[in-house]
Amino acid sequence: MLNDFPISPSISHFLRTLGDNSEIVLDKMLEGPKAFLSALIYHKLNRPIIILTGVERSHGFIDNLETFTNRKIEEFPAWEIVDDSPLFNPDIIGKRFEILSRLKANSKEIIFCPLQAALQYVVSPEILKQNILSFAVNTECDFTKLIASLPPLGYTKVSLVVEKGQFAVRGGLIDIFPNHSLTPYRLEFFGDEITEIRAFDPESQQSQGQVSHFYLFPTDELSLLKGGKTDFFSYLSPDTVVIFDDLLSIEDKYSTLHKTLSSLPFFFSVESLFTTLKKFSRIYCTTSPIEKLSVSYTHLRAHET
């Protein structure tokens, strides 16, 4: 789709300016042009993008970006915090591990990352790698060892799999419902060889079709964090571009989060965040004129020194 748009000299200059560790401020940016420039960075420069924001998913920006790039933009979610305590939602934990795994594989991604998620520690790459299981048809997998390995990953053995985080064993079949998946999977074994993998409906238990492979992530993030933690941005490739989607909203969000997150052990300071981000190219976007931006921009830049 982008091939249909002529690239002006000013946009060409913008793309050339975006080198390693560069820093650009774009004021009075509407959602459409912002999405268009982001898509150009992704397609023309072949660089992954992290969209850092202080608000919930900005549908105008993200919807336009999905149209320009012809891909779904996924959100890296944060834990839910209620009464100054984290809630451990299996869907959120599963999605966090899934995205981290893709980033570690150097996949060129566009990820939407709320400020709260950016300030939360993640499991170190080494710990995550040790706790991911992969399954593929026509591969060897020790049947007995697999059954023994599932409870330490947080999976509960039941007679019938109906919810995420459960597994069941019947003869040479193992049913597993990964915490990041919309459907559970049924593995059929012949000895220690996986001969077939099928998705199935947890209500009817009927098969929904064959799949060639799938990954299984842990359900317990907290215990893994105690074994080794790092920041989200350590998973990114050096050529990643970090786009600050509306500086004013990011500053407002941090003012709201600061008191709550500072008391929790698995979140770090915004000062540490901005120090980490110095190794990436950064684009600061705002809908306001540069005159109104100056106070917010100066305040945020102060955290980088």
Where are these regions (language model features)?
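ASCE RecA-like P-loop NTPase motor cores
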Residues: M1-R301
